[in-house]
């Protein structure tokens, strides 16, 4: 069976990790970035690594991106490059185009120009952290927008007796605790310096 082939465009932390992981899973990976140091770092880890500016018209065709099964556009921080690469991949007939987005407006633009799947890695990371933080488990999530979600989870024993300042969840996990539920009562006026009592059941973030 033919190995599945991917083009990963943009080798920031997200793109670099994705490209290497796919290559380690025996996929054929074409990695593209405009920084020589990124190409040098990944060149021996993927099938092909090429330095190119994806804002240049026709560059993806010249690099053979039309031959891959999936193109992943991971250059969200540069809006022009993100749009250009997504449009080129779609025009080339790549079967499935995944585009990384930084916010809901960016996501709507990518949707309009035909991206098959739009991902928000920072949001996804926050949700994964919330799911895996606690032995009691992740209970529910409400998507408020492409950028924000609200989740409910059980408080782990390791948090009992510590204050929100001690836990520093905003810096460590990129979440904000907005309320604490005890029985049927929900407290939203939280005092960051007060330790969490042992009878707390759930937190909302």
Describe each PLM feature range.
Residues 7-8, 73:
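Hydrophobic Val/Ile/Leu positions in short beta-strands of Rossmann-like dinucleotide-binding domains
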């Amino acid at each position: 069976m033919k190995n599945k082939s991917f083009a990963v465009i943009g080798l920031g932390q997200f793109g670099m990790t994705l490209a290497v992981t796919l290559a380690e899973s025996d996929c054929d990976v074409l990695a593209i970035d405009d920084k020589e140091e990124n190409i040098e770092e990944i060149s021996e880890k993927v099938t092909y690594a090429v330095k190119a500016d994806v804002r240049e018209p026709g560059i993806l065709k010249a690099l053979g991106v039309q031959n891959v099964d999936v193109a992943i556009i991971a250059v969200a921080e540069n809006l022009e490059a993100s749009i250009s690469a997504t449009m080129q991949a779609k025009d080339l007939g790549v079967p499935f185009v995944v585009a990384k987005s930084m916010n809901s407006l960016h996501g709507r633009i990518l949707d309009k120009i035909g991206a098959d799947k739009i991902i928000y890695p920072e949001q996804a990371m926050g949700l994964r952290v919330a799911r895996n933080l606690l032995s009691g488990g992740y209970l529910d999530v409400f998507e408020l927008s492409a950028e924000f979600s609200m989740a409910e989870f059980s408080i782990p024993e390791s948090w009992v007796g510590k204050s929100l300042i001690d836990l520093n969840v905003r810096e460590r996990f990129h979440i904000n605790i907005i309320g604490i539920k005890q029985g049927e009562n929900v407290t939203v006026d939280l005092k960051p310096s007060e330790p969490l009592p042992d009878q707390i059941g759930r937190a909302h973030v």
